[in-house]
Amino acid sequence: MTVAAGAAKAAGAELLDYDEVVARFQPVLGLEVHVELSTATKMFCGCTTTFGGEPNTQVCPVCLGLPGSLPVLNRAAVESAIRIGLALNCEIVPWCRFARKNYFYPDMPKNYQISQYDEPIAINGYLDAPLEDGTTWRVEIERAHMEEDTGKLTHIGSETGRIHGATGSLIDYNRAGVPLIEIVTKPIVGAGARAPQIARSYVTALRDLLRALDVSDVRMDQGSMRCDANVSLKPAGTTEFGTRTETKNVNSLKSVEVAVRYEMQRQGAILASGGRITQETRHFHEAGYTSAGRTKETAEDYRYFPEPDLEPVAPSRELVERLRQTIPELPWLSRRRIQQEWGVSDEVMRDLVNAGAVELVAATVEHGASSEAARAWWGNFLAQKANEAGIGLDELAITPAQVAAVVALVDEGKLSNSLARQVVEGVLAGEGEPEQVMTARGLALVRDDSLTQAAVDEALAANPDVADKIRGGKVAAAGAIVGAVMKATRGQADAARVRELVLEACGQG
């Protein structure tokens, strides 16, 4: 059963074959990415934004919406928003203001969210997303606007963790009021079969950009970066957009791709059978399917009006230019420079990018490892470990500095490559720094020739037939003795030195 078929079965939905979808329809995407900014305090009050605090301990009258409390704008959040807009090639407007987005839901105790509506801080930008085939897709940005995050609801007694079937709900307002920037794309049209890949590549490129700017930790698993994926289909050859759905709070790069593809197939099946798409929000499930949420509101439903308790924001051109000077080398430019420095092919660089290894390799090189050794570790052994654990390379419990330390131990002759892998496994298991793991596990190479010679003599005595072949000139047979010695020494002997001693003992040195 394919992944799509399994998802359809789990959801109880009909899916149209993907090839038929892209033959009959043109997908139109719109991506809205919410990013929590790494400021010390919240958007409109002095409460801390630290993740993981005890529920409802990082709150005050402002973020709880108590009567008489007034918001005070966080300047650092505004500056982060401007830097993001500049990095996205946006126009930073000379004047913008906040608005109240009115809705009744327990995650926002004021019954409105302070956001920006028709006057955002940044407009009309773009981001070039690298694709797997080495090309790029330019995603146009409609706007980037500031707002406050909502509280977090936990539904109890429900098998799905959602409100349906729950016996109660718990609310944590620690997140309420945390600074957010929402980045909204213009419709992505013409992507065809590559639409899911483009969605994932765009979110990946955006994550890398925000990480380089150091404005957010962009931890999708912790909710500091969340993607809402809008998907609609229109019959091939037509110009009018179809009815869209919005899959909310997709929380991993892979899930963005899966959610878009699933919605294309689900909507394709409905349209192919003569049905109509309902404009609604949808929930993404880790099993790879979406389910209906609520009927999608329009802007009019939120009754936006200017926030009366905050003055408009008018960033001076001097401030904008000063912040422009703080924009670091952007990820795709640094990758191009790194590729030239390392002298690797486009194919090798593309593999490193797709694996999420470029920055990790570069950081390992900065700590003293050669680029060849760093690429080998992150691109092979560590990539395998990450794949086995179902996590990203950057989520492994090992740092570039630690990988560089392992490389140094190999270069110094203290470890062989096979022993180095055992050391890395120890680091991943939390056993300490590489040299500590090497010592604690007794993995250092044996450098004492007398001990190695004793192991060689013992192996030759145990294998007289092989020893006679070597003495007779069949030096290739030495490999069997070398293997026996390496086994006896648990891989801690220097294989090259063992071979030398074997040949010398058999008169072939």
Curated annotation (Swiss-Prot):
Lineage: Bacteria, Bacillati, Actinomycetota, Actinomycetes, Mycobacteriales
Species whose genome carries this gene: Mycobacterium tuberculosis (strain ATCC 25618 / H37Rv)
GO BP, sorted A to Z: glutaminyl-tRNAGln biosynthesis via transamidation; translation
Superkingdom: Bacteria
Quaternary structure, from the entry: Heterotrimer of A, B and C subunits.
GO CC, alphabetical: plasma membrane
Entry keyword set: ATP-binding, Ligase, Nucleotide-binding, Protein biosynthesis
UniProt GO molecular function: asparaginyl-tRNA synthase (glutamine-hydrolyzing) activity; ATP binding; glutaminyl-tRNA synthase (glutamine-hydrolyzing) activity
Catalyzed chemical reaction(s): L-glutamyl-tRNA(Gln) + L-glutamine + ATP + H2O = L-glutaminyl-tRNA(Gln) + L-glutamate + ADP + phosphate + H(+); L-aspartyl-tRNA(Asn) + L-glutamine + ATP + H2O = L-asparaginyl-tRNA(Asn) + L-glutamate + ADP + phosphate + 2 H(+)
Enzyme class: ligase
Enzyme Commission number(s) from the entry: 6.3.5.-
Keyword Protein transport among record annotations: no
Function: Allows the formation of correctly charged Asn-tRNA(Asn) or Gln-tRNA(Gln) through the transamidation of misacylated Asp-tRNA(Asn) or Glu-tRNA(Gln) in organisms which lack either or both of asparaginyl-tRNA or glutaminyl-tRNA synthetases. The reaction takes place in the presence of glutamine and ATP through an activated phospho-Asp-tRNA(Asn) or phospho-Glu-tRNA(Gln).
SS bonds (residue pairs): none
Protein name per the record: Aspartyl/glutamyl-tRNA(Asn/Gln) amidotransferase subunit B
InterPro entries, alphabetized: Asn/Gln-tRNA_amidoTrfase_suB/E, Asn/Gln-tRNA_Trfase_suB/E_cat, Asn/Gln_amidotransferase, Asn/Gln_tRNA_amidoTrase-B-like, GatB, GatB_Yqey_C_2, Gln-tRNA_amidoTrfase_suB_CS, Gln_synth/guanido_kin_cat_dom
Similarity annotation: Belongs to the GatB/GatE family. GatB subfamily.
SMART domains named among the record's database cross-references: GatB_Yqey
